[in-house]
């Protein structure tokens, strides 16, 4: 490719003129297309109305109109007023009727539209003002000043204000793509020698000919239909950037054009996308590549795909579960079972993950000379890979490929020595062909079933367990192994529950002294390093949760409670730490019992189970609408969760200025990072009004790593009573927003 010479001033002027003319043409074309589309819709709708009207007229002609007989006025009610009703249609006589007045109906309180939610919904910050808020028919001077300040908070960006004026234009993707394609034709003509930009007026006069323009339009359409187009010249992007500087520099525009053209290609795969494993183009890839979409889209905290509460998903836990793995059947499953091979049974039993008794240390295999077979070395690889520490829970991943896909930082790996006493596995007699899909599926299944080749063969459905075993032996020769330090962690020491309860009290007292500093929890991930002062959990005074990547015996990890009661007093470490009992950690209090929620002994798991009360919505005696409870509740009993949009503190400041102007706000501080806004989305508890003598109270509780707002009964509440809680207004705001205080009833 030849290096282009620096553009001259005439060339730059030429391209700027082309950018302006083509942009104005596209702008006019877009307007024309919009007008034509509106006209077509109007004609279609008018035709439908005409058709419906004609059908109704035909039906009315078939009906016989019968005049109503006039009613005689009742003379027995002289105190009632009479009125005469006259009809404009012929054949109907005037009628005298008694006038009856209707009683005044109380107006329904104003309610703005909102969407119901049952849990929080995280949204992105709105950097562009969606609409100018309506401040009433009479616009005051302070309203104009407020709107100007509001627009300045969004850096002057208002939705729909992209004016089509060069110099202050934000070009849309569709217009930008068409503009570059339209300008690319002039670059092709320059290369062919049909157009010289230095030719001045003579060349401009030729461009204005309609025949030439039509020919150029056909050329553009032909370029669009061609399968492979030449990438536009850099001068085109430079000219567009000079005319529309708000759209970025030439390099940004070039990258933008490349992304838009790749998106328009239907055959192009997205980045890091593996071909369909069931399709004809399936490839043989490693386990982490096959499960890439699963690890990316699946939230391990909510157990949902495309979670809307954790946009930054935590890395999957690299430790094995503590339950028993699937055992290998001691007897062969058939004539083609791998257990019939010489040395296969010893190989499988040696490599099968085995449970260990409490306090029993892992035994290391003796290192032998390098003359051992490769099969033996691979077998030792599988042994280390399959071992797990049941007592400590500090197990390595199910396979090395899974571990690499789950860890953010790659672990150091080295070869493994072979065991001294291991039989050589019989080599396959006939080569068996494996497709890419089968090889990929084997690597995925092996991370879960390990050396249970009979189960893997049944899942594959196309290979016998003997063939699966032979392929596993072949695969183990190239698998890398984790280091001995990661495979053989130190034995876990039992933590004394009383010492841990005292530690929780000390941490909680520290938080109570600085109660405003409550930060959002993010799982820590610092491999090969304990949780110290640099750990994000310790820096934010949060406990390490089960989602953290630190060691299970971390001193900052919350172990749960060992209560045998209802967990509703400060004797429970979970209740003391203002968090709900975790069903994965608290195994004795009843939080882990999922079958019958109504008979669970633990009373500290209501939010995560959604055990809310039945609430009613009705006009309030204080202001607007109010929330009423249908059933009676006891003191400190959970009523409902305050749900809404989860927004940042900066977004809450921008929205709060508009809400203060309307004198209606549903913002609720969650922690130092996020705020719950129930204005657009929420549940019925959003209508609970403020009171200095409330019957409810709000509490921010840590529930499975997430801060959530629970509304609890401050005293015993009777059925049908309206709910109030303290908004914690300042003295000035309380006088400004709360004009009526409810009458306190004595129960």
UniProtKB/Swiss-Prot annotation:
EC class of the enzyme, as a word: transferase
Tagged with keyword Nucleus: yes
Domain CXC: 504-606
Family recorded in the similarity comment: Belongs to the class V-like SAM-binding methyltransferase superfamily. Histone-lysine methyltransferase family. EZ subfamily.
Protein name per UniProt: Histone-lysine N-methyltransferase EZH1
Regions annotated as coiled coil: none
Record gene name: Ezh1
Compositionally biased tracts (Low complexity): 369-381
Residues in SET domain copies: 613-728
Residue stretches of biased makeup (Basic and acidic residues): 194-211, 382-393
Origin species: Mus musculus (Mouse)
């Amino acid at each position: 490719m030849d290096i282009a010479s620096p553009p001259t001033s005439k060339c730059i002027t030429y391209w700027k003129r082309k950018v302006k003319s083509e942009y104005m043409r596209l702008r006019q074309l877009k307007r024309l297309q919009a007008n034509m589309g509106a006209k077509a819709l109007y004609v279609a709708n008018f035709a439908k109305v005409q058709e419906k009207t004609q059908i109704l007229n035909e039906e009315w002609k078939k009906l016989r109109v019968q005049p109503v007989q006039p009613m005689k006025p009742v003379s027995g009610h002289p105190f009632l007023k009479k009125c005469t009703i006259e009809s404009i249609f012929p054949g109907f006589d005037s009628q005298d009727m008694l006038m009856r007045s209707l009683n005044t109906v109380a107006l329904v309180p104003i309610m703005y539209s909102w969407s119901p939610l049952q849990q929080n919904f995280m949204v992105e910050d709105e950097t562009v003002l969606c609409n100018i808020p309506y401040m009433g028919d009479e616009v005051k001077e302070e309203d104009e000043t407020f709107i100007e300040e509001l627009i300045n908070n969004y850096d002057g960006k208002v939705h729909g204000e992209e004016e089509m004026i060069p110099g202050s234009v934000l070009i849309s993707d569709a217009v930008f793509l068409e503009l570059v394609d339209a300008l690319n034709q002039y670059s092709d003509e320059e290369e062919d020698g049909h157009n010289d930009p230095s030719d001045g007026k003579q060349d401009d006069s030729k461009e204005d000919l309609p025949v030439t323009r039509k020919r150029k339009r056909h050329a553009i359409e032909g370029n669009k239909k061609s399968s492979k187009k030449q990438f536009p010249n850099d001068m085109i992007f430079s000219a567009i950037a000079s005319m529309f500087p708000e759209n970025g520099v030439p390099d940004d525009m070039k990258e933008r054009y490349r992304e838009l053209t790749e998106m328009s290609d239907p055959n192009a795969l997205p980045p890091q996308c593996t071909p369909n494993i069931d399709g004809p183009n399936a490839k043989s890839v490693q386990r982490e590549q096959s499960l890439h979409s699963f690890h990316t889209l699946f939230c391990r905290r909510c157990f949902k795909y495309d979670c809307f509460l954790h946009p930054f998903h935590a890395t999957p836990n690299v430790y094995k579960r503590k339950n028993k793995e699937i055992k290998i059947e001691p007897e062969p499953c058939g004539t083609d079972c791998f257990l019939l091979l010489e040395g296969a049974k010893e190989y499988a039993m040696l490599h099968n993950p085995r449970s260990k008794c409490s306090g029993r240390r892992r035994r290391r295999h003796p290192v032998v000379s390098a003359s051992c077979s490769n099969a033996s070395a691979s077998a030792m690889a599988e042994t280390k890979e399959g071992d797990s520490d049941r007592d400590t829970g500090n197990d390595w991943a199910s396979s090395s490929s899974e571990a690499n896909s789950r860890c953010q930082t790659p672990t150091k790996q080295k070869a493994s020595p072979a065991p001294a006493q291991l039989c050589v596995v019989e080599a396959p007699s006939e080569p068996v062909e494996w497709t890419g899909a089968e090889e990929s599926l084997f690597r995925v299944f092996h991370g879960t079933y390990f050396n249970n080749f009979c189960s893997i063969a049944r899942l594959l459905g196309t290979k016998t367990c003997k063939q699966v075993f032979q392929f596993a032996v072949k695969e183990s020769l190239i698998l890398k192994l984790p280091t001995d330090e990661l495979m053989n962690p130190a034995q876990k020491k039992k933590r004394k529950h009383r010492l841990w309860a005292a530690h929780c009290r000390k941490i909680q007292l520290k938080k109570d002294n600085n109660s405003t500093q409550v930060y959002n929890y993010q799982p820590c991930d610092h491999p090969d390093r304990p949780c110290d002062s640099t750990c994000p959990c310790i820096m934010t005074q949060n406990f390490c949760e089960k989602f953290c990547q630190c060691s299970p015996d971390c001193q900052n990890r919350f172990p749960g409670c060992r209560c045998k009661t209802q967990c509703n007093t400060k004797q429970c470490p979970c209740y003391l730490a203002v968090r709900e009992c975790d069903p994965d950690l608290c195994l004795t209090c009843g939080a882990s019992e999922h079958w019958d929620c109504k008979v669970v002994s633990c009373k500290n798991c209501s939010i995560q189970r959604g055990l809310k009360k039945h609430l009613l919505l009705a006009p309030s005696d204080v202001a607007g609408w109010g929330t009423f409870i249908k059933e009676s509740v006891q003191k400190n009993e959970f009523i409902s969760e305050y749900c809404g949009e989860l927004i940042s503190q900066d977004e809450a400041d921008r929205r709060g200025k508009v809400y203060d102007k309307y004198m209606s706000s549903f913002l609720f501080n969650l922690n130092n990072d996020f705020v719950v806004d129930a204005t657009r989305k929420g549940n019925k508890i959003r209508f609970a009004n403020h009171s200095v003598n409330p019957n409810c109270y709000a509490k921010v509780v840590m529930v499975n790593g997430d801060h959530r707002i629970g509304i609890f009964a401050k005293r015993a509440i009777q059925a049908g009573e309206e709910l109030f809680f303290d908004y914690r207004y300042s003295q000035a705001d309380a006088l400004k927003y709360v004009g009526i205080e409810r009458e306190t009833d004595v129960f």
